């Protein structure tokens, strides 16, 4: 009686939800094919809340006994097929394979599988929801979705028809569906598979880790030790290729144990949805007040941000150029589910690697996908054998793909081997990496290759002290040019920004750094400056998250200035032997830098003031590589004065206004065919 009531409820739900009409349409497709199948597979979308409201018993079966619930729907669908004559070829109920796809699970702790908790409840054979980031995935292989068996005794009535049909159920291995020791229930003779009726489906395995685990990659020693492990997710049929390496997903599935060389916990996925991070509604009150006080200028707010940023690591007012570039790189990070390529890569030349390392590590942790590349692992994807014994090849993410939509901090550039640097240069130039899969090595007839987009910004630094010890520095004959002989010139060019923080640069104030170090030694956990109390790390995290969410558009003046500077700079840096020293990617960096400064200023329109900052930053980098041009930008052009009070901010604005006029003159002189309008025009 209870089963009959659940069947009635299932039919009512299918009718109300539109599932019955979809089922009829699917049946029509099977019937029109005029082909006889061993298994007819139907996917039914289920909203657990709606089912529970309709019938509590059926809802309970769907949530806690999904295999029994599937049999209820199987019976209902079989009756519907026979009553309405939907599929003429269908003979038995066992031929119908019902897959219940859940839209969601109740928001209760008992339905959540936390990969950091122990023990994991995986024996109940019911649905759980888990959330994680894909760190590895296999190539696609086939599995047996369903098979038809016949009694080997020709006299037996079951030697014909579709009485023995086996279908894959969640958690079952291939041998559970197809093997040679099945016996006939009528005469006990062995069953033989009718191979022409075998139905194959696609299968893929991905590995995920919980988001909490990212603390292990961020170099934050304050975090307490915790347990985590990767979890294998089996994707089948329509779910194959729905997950990408580096992306974060919410997964509904049934935990199972797979016994290979060792028992491994896996999940048979039922439904997957991309995880979307929540965007903060605004910024902190202190930043809001600062924005209001500096609203008369397009440059003051970002100058103050750079001035007070990371006061836990360096004294306010020091390393301002580097801090501004870091903030601009951070606001250009994006939700990893968006396909964007406006990253800002930064290479720092320094003689104080410890301080720069701390500063970059601190900044990286302000975004959710900040990865500090461990020396013992690979930056880019690698190939290995699949540990689940399915014959597929497993592709491991590497730090670059794990940092998708964020920052990949690879440390000292000189610590990497030559082949890795060449791979890095290729990835920076193409924003993609290709993985080669040799077929002979992994038991396949053909070689394969897979290409993955690189959607993170790379940060690195070069130790000038090690450079002077290993090589005799070359004396440059060009004004402003710096010796970067320790790293290949093409690799240095592939980084969008080259920042000089050596002792000779204005970005390396010695006395404030010494004072800060001494204060920090006395009070390691203390807030040494008022700025640390007024603008906390949480305030900066909120500011960056809000700035990243802004939708930007370019003003006509900004576009003209960007294109004008690019053409003029490209023309002036061209010689008859080597051609232009300015690559086509420089235009992309100019656009990205302009957008980043406008975003950091919390504006939705890129102005020519933002284009000026972009041009100055790129010109400083180009001068370090190739020497100065008639534009002649000073190394400290963005911060010519120490920002003590409002008067110094005003002087900086006047200086930048002069730089803007100088840039317009440079464009007019060296970039023929480019029009730059004054504010009056």
UniProtKB/Swiss-Prot annotation:
Domain of life (superkingdom): Eukaryota
InterPro entries: MCM, MCM_lid, P-loop_NTPase
The entry's keywords: DNA damage, DNA repair, Meiosis, Phosphoprotein
GO MF annotation: an example: DNA binding
GO process terms (BP): double-strand break repair involved in meiotic recombination; late meiotic recombination nodule assembly; meiotic recombination nodule assembly; oogenesis; spermatogenesis; synaptonemal complex assembly
Primary role: Plays an important role in meiotic recombination and associated DNA double-strand break repair.
Stated name of the protein: Minichromosome maintenance domain-containing protein 2
Native source organism of the sequence: Mus musculus (Mouse)
Lineage: Eukaryota, Metazoa, Chordata, Craniata, Vertebrata
